[in-house]
A protein has these predicted regions:
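N-terminal Rossmann-like dinucleotide-binding module
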Residues: 1-46, 175-176
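Nucleotide donor/acceptor-binding cores
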Residues: 2, 115, 142-145
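Alpha-helical elements of Rossmann-like donor-binding domains used by nucleotide-donor carbohydrate transfer enzymes
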Residues: 15, 41, 57, 66, ...
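Short, Asp-centered acidic motifs that coordinate Mg2+ and/or phosphate
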Residues: 30, 66, 146
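Conserved SAM-binding strand-loop segment of SAM-dependent methyltransferases
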Residues: 48-55
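Beta-strand-loop-alpha-helix segment that lines the small-molecule cofactor/substrate pocket
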Residues: 66-73, 77-124
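Oxidoreductase and adenylate-handling cofactor-binding alpha/beta cores
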Residues: 125-146, 165-184
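Pol beta-like nucleotidyltransferase catalytic core
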Residues: 149-159
Length: 184
């Protein structure tokens, strides 16, 4: 079982914590959020989860194997960097960071330290996308010459990101997964 802590308990944090708790592969050890009011609910429903440790204490805790970062995009790089430097496996809500150079630095550091760095691109794991990939890989559909993607749900407005980093990244992760190559 992987002992995991979650940083960020705003919009996605509660969903992630719920899913981790329901998994038989994870033990949620702690949840950290700068806003203590956000974590009061979990302290009542799951009293065994430590709440609002300081970030420094959290990454120094040797009983924690991995940390999930579910915070605003502008914080992803620094938090992930500190977690990797502390020897923790890292799960980051998409996007990994706000620039490709920062992303590459995190990837290189994770490789150097032999740690898992996972970005939460969930769509490739949905049954619909897996079925389409199966059809493409089997050549059942023939050669795919064109792929069109339409975003019909804009989600929450993100003040620290743009539509490409926040939403189009879902479509790009699906395309890369389906065709095993970068879109042009």
């Amino acid at each position: 079982m992987i002992n995991i802590a979650v940083i960020g308990y705003g919009y996605w944090g509660p969903n992630l914590v719920r899913n981790l708790i329901n998994s038989n592969k994870f033990n949620v050890k702690a949840v950290f959020d700068l806003d203590q009011q956000k974590t009061q609910v979990i302290s009542k429903t799951h009293p065994n989860i430590e709440i609002n440790k300081s970030f420094t204490e959290l990454i120094s805790d040797n009983s924690i194997d991995a940390i999930a970062i579910v915070t605003p995009i502008s914080t992803h790089y620094k938090l992930a960097l500190d977690c990797l430097n502390a020897g923790k496996h890292v799960f980051v809500e998409k996007p990994l960071s706000d620039s490709s150079s920062k992303c590459q630095k995190l990837i290189d550091l994770a490789d150097l330290k032999k740690l898992v760095l996972f970005v939460d691109h969930t769509f490739p794991y949905t049954e619909a996308v897996k079925k389409v990939k199966e059809l493409i890989d089997s050549d059942h559909l023939g050669k795919i010459l064109y792929f069109d993607s339409t975003r019909i749900n804009l989600g929450l407005f993100q003040f620290d990101s743009n539509v490409i980093w926040d939403l189009a990244i879902h479509d790009l992760s699906i395309i890369i997964n389906l065709f095993n190559e970068m879109p042009i």
